[in-house]
């Protein structure tokens, strides 16, 4: 069950698979230093909390928090129970006190980690596939199965803006530029819609259409803007590839090939120099952004690897 004690190796990469295991790896060496089974869970998303050593798994239908530095890291230290269907998105405010989640039950929920309870709830008409927090820390942006993108104002407790790029085409993934100036939405037709985000301190955020990018000919399962000054957009697709787009003109910079099945998830390193991906071919892979080449293959899962997250220290 455990391949090593978690104390002697910091967490660099976490992956979850349909084989009902969560694995933790050293990103540089490719060594899986421990794993644990979760036979009663279906994990859709993994996130490391702002508090070091803790991992959150968005499951069906609950959210579970694991303390990776405890003597029993496989036993959840907290269970967040309120959603009634698959939890598809989870994330945190930078202070670490507030957690947000989005679910196929059509809700976006706000949790206070100090009291373990759902504090607020926003309702969407259809299943929620993706939720991101704007860098201003006061707005959540959600995308749903009917193609709606909604901005939820946490100060006013209301939907302040709604965008519908393609009626009826599911929004699969959302990403926001680190400085809040750009928002990208990816859908099931392989299209990315890009807006310039106009932020005013005293008013709500406004969105100005900037670009429409036909990135793939099939589902985009994850889109992600790079951190810092690296101006790239990564799109992971059911066509087995990950494409890297230069934001200056939205030109195709690189195509990362090597996965043999759908690529479900991706995550940039903190400096934007590397990208990790998760695929139905059971592997996770590490890529160099400069070379556009595969640096490492993480292979131990027996079924599809559906989500991955890199430690941001």
UniProtKB/Swiss-Prot annotation:
GO terms for cellular component: TORC1 complex; TORC2 complex. WD repeats lie at residues 1-35, 38-76, 82-121, 123-162, 166-205, 215-255, 258-297. Disruption phenotype: No visible phenotype under normal growth conditions. Keywords: Repeat, WD repeat. PANTHER family: G BETA-LIKE PROTEIN GBL, TARGET OF RAPAMYCIN COMPLEX SUBUNIT LST8. Belongs to the WD repeat LST8 family. The existence of a second LST8 copy gene is specific to Arabidopsis and could be the result of a recent duplication. The expression of this duplicated gene (At2g22040) could not be detected experimentally. Could be a non-functional gene. This is Non-functional target of rapamycin complex subunit LST8-2. The gene is LST8-2.
């Amino acid at each position: 069950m455990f391949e090593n004690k978690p104390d002697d190796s910091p967490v660099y990469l976490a992956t979850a698979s349909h084989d009902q295991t969560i694995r933790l790896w050293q990103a540089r060496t490719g060594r899986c230093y421990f794993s644990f089974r979760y036979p009663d869970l279906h994990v859709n998303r993994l996130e490391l909390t702002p508090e070091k050593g803790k991992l959150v798994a968005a499951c069906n239908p609950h959210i579970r928090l694991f303390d990776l530095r405890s003597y029993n890291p496989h036993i959840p230290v907290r269970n967040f129970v309120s959603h009634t269907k698959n939890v598809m998105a989870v994330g945190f405010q930078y202070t670490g006190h507030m957690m947000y989640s989005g679910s196929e039950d059509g809700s976006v929920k706000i949790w206070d980690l100090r009291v373990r309870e759902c504090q607020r709830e926003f309702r969407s008409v259809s299943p929620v596939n993706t939720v991101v927090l704007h860098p201003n820390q006061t707005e959540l942006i959600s995308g749903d199965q009917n193609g709606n993108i909604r901005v939820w104002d946490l100060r006013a407790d209301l939907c302040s803006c709604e965008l519908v790029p393609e009626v009826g085409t599911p929004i699969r993934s959302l990403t926001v530029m680190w400085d809040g100036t750009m928002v990208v939405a990816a859908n099931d037709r392989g299209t990315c819609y890009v807006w310039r985000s106009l932020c005013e301190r005293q008013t709500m955020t406004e969105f100005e259409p900037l670009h429409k990018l036909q990135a793939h000919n099939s589902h985009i399962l994850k889109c992600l803007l790079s951190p810092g000054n690296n101006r790239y957009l990564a799109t992971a697709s059911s066509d087995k590839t990950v494409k890297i787009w230069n934001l200056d003109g939205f030109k195709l910079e690189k195509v990362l090939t090597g996965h043999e099945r759908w690529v479900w998830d991706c995550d940039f390193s903190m400096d934007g120099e590397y990208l990790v991906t998760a695929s139905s071919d059971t592997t996770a892979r590490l890529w160099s952004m400069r070379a556009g080449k595969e640096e490492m293959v993480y292979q131990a899962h027996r079924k599809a690897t559906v989500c991955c997250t890199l430690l941001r220290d």
